Amino acid sequence: MNLDGLIVGLGNPGKEYENTRHNLGFMLADALLDEVRRTAPHAVTSLGTGKKKYDLWKCAPLTGGSSWLVAKPLTFMNRSGDAVAHICGFYRIPPEKILVLHDELDLPLGRMKFKTAGGLAGHNGLKSIAERTGSKDFHRLRLGIGKPQSGQTTGYVLGRFGKDEQALVEKVLQAGVEGIRIFAQQGAVAATQFINAQDIQ
């Protein structure tokens, strides 16, 4: 299988975590798959859903015919690296060809940043991926969720977006899908320029 790389949306499995702030990476992965299916219905191929470690799809048209894998780990956030390491080992994908989609407390909702390698910003999903792949050299699309006013981080990230935030979340997902397309087609520099300029209101 000729692959350009792996796109990983981070989140926690199970209905109790659906549409929570910590699952914004899952939500963007779903939005990407939905958009590809909408424009090219036969371009998304399931490579196994409901597996022990991950759901996985092949997305053909992101770069005009070549293929990317899209994954959602089912191992819970703190063990996301188990799924990523398994996929990368099986399909021989190096860390520099991985793009991780994840929530980011240090950015407000409506802002996003593209980053390659470097620190992990205390994100347990990123820590797990770095530990299990043995590298920090993967790309990240950091999706702002803002910080809680009270400082109770766990309850905040596991809470759902409010009704007044839903329209903004949809705009973020649309911009995120476009950012992923730019990354797949033009590379990290172009993706950084587009994504880091986003200030969605």
UniProtKB/Swiss-Prot annotation:
TRNA binds at residues 17, 76, 78, 124. It is an enzyme of class 3 (hydrolase). Keywords: Cytoplasm, Hydrolase, RNA-binding, tRNA-binding. GO terms for biological process: protein quality control for misfolded or incompletely synthesized proteins; rescue of stalled ribosome. The keyword tRNA-binding applies. PROSITE patterns: PEPT_TRNA_HYDROL_1, PEPT_TRNA_HYDROL_2. GO terms for cellular component: cytoplasm. Monomer. This is Peptidyl-tRNA hydrolase. It comes from Oleidesulfovibrio alaskensis (strain ATCC BAA-1058 / DSM 17464 / G20). The gene is pth.
